[in-house]
Regions:
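Short, hydrophobic/aliphatic alpha-helical segments
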Residues: 3-12, 246-262
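Cytochrome P450 catalytic-domain helical core, especially the substrate-recognition surface
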Residues: 15-43, 54-57, 64-68, 82-163, ...
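Conserved cytochrome P450 K-helix E-x-x-R motif and the immediately C-terminal K′/meander segment
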Residues: 26-46, 219, 302-334
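Structural preference for long, well-ordered alpha-helical segments in enzyme cores
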Residues: 70, 130, 154, 217, ...
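Short Gly/aromatic-enriched secondary-structure transition segments
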Residues: 70-76
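Cytochrome P450 catalytic-core helices
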Residues: 154, 268-293
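Proline-centered turn/helix-capping motifs that create local helix->coil transitions or kinks
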Residues: 166-167, 182-190, 221-232, 285, ...
Length: 334
């Protein structure tokens, strides 16, 4: 099916699909167990399914060909999904929710700030965070909650890579990121946007967490605005536009990009690492091969670089398989 045919099917709602409940459609079923709902729906109706989510209509596609056309070939046909509006209270006008000229400008600056050379410079930060956590595990010898540990690891690594190795996120910062991630996930599957404006406990917790993180980020931006230090992501964002002869990002724009990187990066990475540890615990043969490869690599003198880490081919293959089986971004919307 071509991009035009997918778009036409969407507008005519001719694809098969479940009817759902009056007014609510299939939203309650999808919210209860999204993955099970999608698996059962596609098994019954095929690769292209029409759904009604409250007042909204949606088309779900799973075939590789149709997904490729929607995500890559259909840029002019399929713009940003209305669902991305749900991210704006958290990330403002960041790269993820930008379009047109604003997106191109922000993307160019983000590419400059996240170039291979820039990522290479952050590896020492990532290694330091991992070594600290490994030291804690060796000292305690207690069972570990992998999901909690990987969340804490990724937020810590993200925080230091953005603002410098000397900064450590306290428990309140970790709690605030967890609160924002949880509430954004809940809102993403809500079909009643007005609920987000009610004074519920979840909405109040989200607003309080966002306000505290906003104050912290703006303070860090203000403290660094006149510096030329580009050793972390904040410094690179401050310098990237200047290096390309463009107007510098405003404090608000830098704030939005920091939240975009933070919220998009920490949860997906933590999820992947958590599933990786489950694979290591479940597949003993795989775990032994990973351990042997890493041990041999380390004994030869570990090369903490993109090229050096690339020599861990079996470990990379295991991570790729974890991503295939347990994709952290398992639903994309246009």
């Amino acid at each position: 099916m071509s991009t035009a045919e997918i778009a036409a099917s969407s507008s005519r709602a001719t694809a098969p699909g479940p009817r759902g409940l009056p007014f609510l459609g299939v939203a309650p079923h999808m919210k209860r167990d999204p993955l099970a709902f999608m698996r059962d729906t596609f098994a019954r109706y095929g690769d292209i399914v029409a759904l009604r989510l409250g007042p909204q209509r949606a088309m779900l596609v799973t075939s590789p060909e149709a997904a490729h056309q929607v995500l890559l070939d259909g840029g002019k046909t399929f713009g940003l999904s209305p669902l991305y509006e749900k991210l704006k209270p958290a990330i403002g006008g960041g790269l993820t929710v930008s379009e047109g000229a604003a997106w191109r400008r922000r993307r160019g600056i983000a590419q400059q700030a996240m170039s291979p050379r820039s990522v290479q410079a952050l590896i020492a930060t990532f290694v330091g965070c991992a070594e600290e956590l490994a030291g804690e595990w060796r000292a305690s010898k207690a069972p570990v909650d992998a999901a909690e540990a990987m969340f804490r690891l990724t937020v810590t690594a993200m925080f230091r890579s953005m603002f410098g190795q000397d900064l450590r996120p306290g428990p309140e910062v970790l709690d605030d990121f967890a609160t924002m991630s949880r509430e954004l996930g809940r809102r993403f599957f809500s079909t009643l946007p007005w609920l987000e404006h009610l004074p519920t406990s979840g909405n109040r917790a989200f607003a309080a967490a966002k306000a505290r993180l906003d104050r912290l980020v703006y303070q860090l931006i203000a403290a660094r605005s006149d510096e030329d230090d580009a050793s972390d992501l904040l410094g690179r964002l401050l310098q990237a536009a200047k290096a390309e002869g463009r107007a510098r990002l405003t404090s608000e724009e830098i704030h939005d990009e920091i939240f975009t990187f933070a919220l998009a990066g920490h949860e997906t990475t933590a999820s992947t690492l958590t599933w990786f540890w489950l694979a290591m615990a479940s597949e003993q043969d795989v775990a032994r091969k990973v351990e042997a490869e890493v041990a041999a690599w380390h004994a030869a003198g570990p090369e903490w670089s993109l090229e050096g880490l690339g020599r861990l081919t079996y470990t990379r293959a295991v991570l790729d398989e974890v991503l295939r089986l347990f994709a952290p971004a398992w639903l994309l919307s246009r």
